[in-house]
Structures are given as C-alpha cells and as structure tokens.
C-alpha cells in the first residue's frame, strides 16, 4: 500500500535547527534502506504557487500565498504493508520535530494512495 504524507505547520519565529535536518536525513536513509520511502521533498511557501478552483462551472486561478494559517512544508511517499506501518513512520518523523525543535507546531496527514486493490 502506498501512503502520501503531507507535513504542514506554522511559520515559527526561529529557523529549524541543523540537528533536525541531520535527524531527518538519517530517518530518510533508514526508510530508503528498508525500501519503503519512494519519494520525498520540501515544498516552497505557498507564495510561489497557484491554486486552480472550480465552482459553479467556472475555473479561477489564484496566485499564492493562500490564507490558511498552516503552510504545506513537505511530502513523502511511502510503500508499506499497512496503515499502522505508515503511522509509525509518520510518528517517528513528528517525534524528531518535537524533540529537536521545541515550540514548533504542525501535523502530518497520512493518506492512502489508490491502487489496483481499490478497483476490485
């Protein structure tokens, strides 16, 4: 099963500490070695993006930044055996933020990607 993990958070007053990046790289290496991490990348702030909306039959393009209070920060695509395994990887990632960047607040949404098993 594939799971997409989307990290979002507030824009804190302090930049992330270098130790956090080192720990994230180590965890990513471990997930890659285990064969479960398929792709991951950071995302630029929404100010550099756009949104295409459809409402009432009309399409609208809106340039960022978007008004949501939390920014999408990064994504990761995992292939794991179960939802529980996906949650374990996501939890480990969030624990790094808790332990190495006190005061930072955010969330990781873990969404299953549709696959052949969903079209039975």
Residue ranges of predicted features:
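Conserved, structured core segments of small domains
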Residues: 1-120
């Amino acid at each position: 099963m594939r799971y997409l993990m989307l990290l979002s958070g507030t824009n804190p007053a302090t930049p992330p500490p270098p130790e956090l990046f080192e720990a994230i790289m180590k965890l990513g290496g471990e997930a890659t070695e285990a064969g479960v991490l398929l792709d991951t990348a950071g995302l630029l702030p929404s100010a550099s993006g756009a949104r295409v909306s459809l409402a009432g039959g009309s399409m609208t393009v809106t340039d960022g930044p978007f008004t949501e209070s939390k920014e999408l920060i990064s994504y990761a695509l995992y292939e794991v055996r179960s939802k529980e395994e996906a949650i374990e990887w996501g939890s480990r990632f969030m624990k790094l933020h808790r332990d190495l960047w006190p005061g930072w607040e955010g969330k990781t949404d873990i969404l299953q990607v549709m696959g052949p098993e969903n079209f039975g």
